Structures are given as structure tokens and as C-alpha cells.
Amino acid sequence: MFITYGRGGFVIKSNKDKSVARASAESEIHSMSNATSRGAYELDFGKSQQHLKENDQCHLYEDNQAVIHMANNGRSYSDKTRHIKIHHYFVKQHLDNGEFTLSHCPTQEMIADILTKPIQGSQFIKLRNRLLGYEEVFPNLVWGVWK
């Protein structure tokens, strides 16, 4: 997870999942749920310290299209996703009440991947520069969470 405020990151975290997932989408939605929880805390803290405005939103970036679909539409009742627990509506709840927005981020642009995958060459340099704030990720973005 990588949380930005302005140009640079202020929360950078990488850890091994504590649960075993049957599918990659389940693992991704677990991670998104954790990132949403941390993002909600940081958003509330920023507002309480008056560093953020009351109408500021947190932007979630995800590279898995299936997870984006599940988060936007709630739990899917297909055979492949019926085992995902209902508590993952947590993400949808934050999206629905407007605190968070969710966008697709191509795998090549996913900053959090530098923490978990063996990236080399120019891709590593590009993601490292964004992670350290040397290069703007999105010029108009104030607050973002890469999961």
C-alpha cells in the first residue's frame, strides 16, 4: 500500500497477507479493504488536523478489473466469487458515500508494485521516482491510495 499526499508518499507499507485466498480477486479485495480502512483513517485525521478540506476525497487505484467491478457493484453471486465474505461491502460503502473514488491503474503505472514485485530497469527507475516524489504521479491529485 502506498498513500500519497501532494507529490510524495507518507504511508508506504508492504506485508504478507495473513489469510489464504482461493482466487486472486479475493486476495485483491482483501487488500483493497485494508487499504480503504487505512485510507479512511488518514482522511479523517487529515480533516481533523485541517490539512484537508471536508469535501476532499481519497482516490483508490487498482490494477485488477474484476475487483473494480466487485467494489463498484457489490458482491457478485457468480460461482467464482460466492465465497467472498459480506464484510467486503466495506469498500462499496465508502465508494457509495463519496469518501472514496476508485480508478483503474495499469499494471505498468502501479506504484505499489515496486514493494512486492521484482521490477527492473527503466520501470524500476520510473516507479522509484514517483514513490519518492521526484516525479508527479497525477498533477491534480491531492490524496491517493495505491494498493
What are these regions (language model features)?
Residues 1-25:
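RNase H-like nuclease fold core
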Residues 18-147:
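RNase H-like nuclease module associated with reverse transcription
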